[in-house]
Amino acid sequence: MQYAPALEHLVGNTPLIKLQNASEETGCTILGKAEFRNPGQSVKDRAALFIIKDAIAKGMLRPGGVIVEGTAGNTGIGLAVVGASMGFKTVIVIPDTQSQEKKDALRLLGAQLVEVPAVPYKNPNNYVRYSGRLAAEIAKTSPNGAIWANQFLSLIHISEPTRHES
């Protein structure tokens, strides 16, 4: 029986699928990457894993530490899935306009949700900006570290090793 030693080992290495109609219409082989095969069913699982691994490598996060992110999308799910499997707590700051299904899914994955009013980014209480301040506050008292994942500005997203992972 084959098995993965841990959930994070299932992130990436997703298969390629030949897109038959597109291939026939173009005369080229067109392939799609099956990112839905990641544990959180999204390409954002990759970003989550690399952000977390980067924080661990830099000594900013140890098991039991806290990952904070402001997100209305799949990054929160990726951070919750991968973070929980690696022994981290996840706090997601989310606009109160998001669907109940998304909120329920995040909670089922173990994330703590902080719901804030949906306001423009220029407002200091925008969910992304709020999450940065919250991460800084949590970091002051978390003995195992706390990070702001900061998906929108994280340089780990554009580093050479990340871009070429399969």
Q: Language-model segments: which ranges?
A:
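Phosphate-handling active-site elements
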Residues: 56-65, 87-94
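Short, small-residue-enriched loops and turns at beta-alpha junctions
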Residues: 38-41, 120-124, 155-156
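Positively charged, low-complexity intrinsically disordered leader regions
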Residues: 1-63
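Active-site-proximal loop->helix
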Residues: 75-136
